[in-house]
Amino acid sequence: MSDDSDLTSRRKPKSRRAPKARTRGQRVRRGILFTLLALVLAAGGTVYWLYSQLDGNIKSVDIDKALGDERPEKLPTAGQNLLVLGSDSRAGAENKELGGGGAVSGARSDTAMVVHIPEGRSKAVAVSIPRDTLVTRPVCSKSDGSDLPEANRVMFNSVYSLAGPACVVKTVEKMSGVRIDHYLEINFAGFKDLVDAIGGVTVDVPQDINDKASGLNLTAGPHKLNGTESLAYVRTRHGIGDGSDLGRIGLQQQFLMALLSEIKSQDLLGSPASSYKIANSATKALTTDSGLASLTSLAEFGRSMNGVDPGSMETIMLPVAYDKQDRNRVVAAEPQAGELWEAIRTDATIPESAKKSPATGG
């Protein structure tokens, strides 16, 4: 009896401890699973919040709805055409300060380029439209719903301030016969912040620049420019050439190539959320057509451009001649301008004669 009692007494503690050990282990494993699940959900929620915020930063314009069907025909082999505008909007405190204070109201298209990406997307060409070009502005709808009548001999950069981006697209399509597929606009402050966010952009300054109006002073040679310096560089007109808009177009084109090279090297378009700081700066600055107005659409467009080498992108100024009535203005030079637009419309090689501008700004 005593032996049996001893055996029973030894077994009882063992039978009581085993369930407790299993329960404790289950609780630990269950706790780990719940923690991991919470972390996954939190990470997913954070990613969703980041994407939602970045998507919400992008402003858009429904170009197709605004322009309707009265547009150039989209040819099967026409590639892709993107209108890029640099807006000198004074909206917001930072834009106002960068734009030179309160002396100028409203906004204008300070920089305008038609970027043509041929079929296959292995190369591209950027055509700069001088802001002082006299154009025929078509009938456009204003933001209040009223119509802005057609007008001849108006400055190209005034179209934006009078009727907004859709009218700029319509004006470019009218003067070129080129169907614009996408629209992208960046403002003063956004340009500055984007350059600062990516760590600056290196450019090879072609000649000494001493612009008293902007305070930009650079010697010829390579310089890594921050955001404020970059903005002054692409906007300087008194520090180079004849002081007109034509002189600075070369600097704008050069800077665009350097900026695109930096963006491509950091894969900012292919993976726009890889760096939240950069993506936040970029998306806050952007206004696009509705087809590009999301991170997903921008990333897809960026990945489709991976085959394009910014170093081989051709940059051309729209051939212009000094206006006979006002030497401070220019007009499209014919037949060069017509040949240039025809080549872009048909995705053909641009003839050398279409790259020569009678007015150079030198």
Predicted segments with their positions:
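Non-catalytic, solvent-exposed segments at the cell envelope interface
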Residues: 2-362
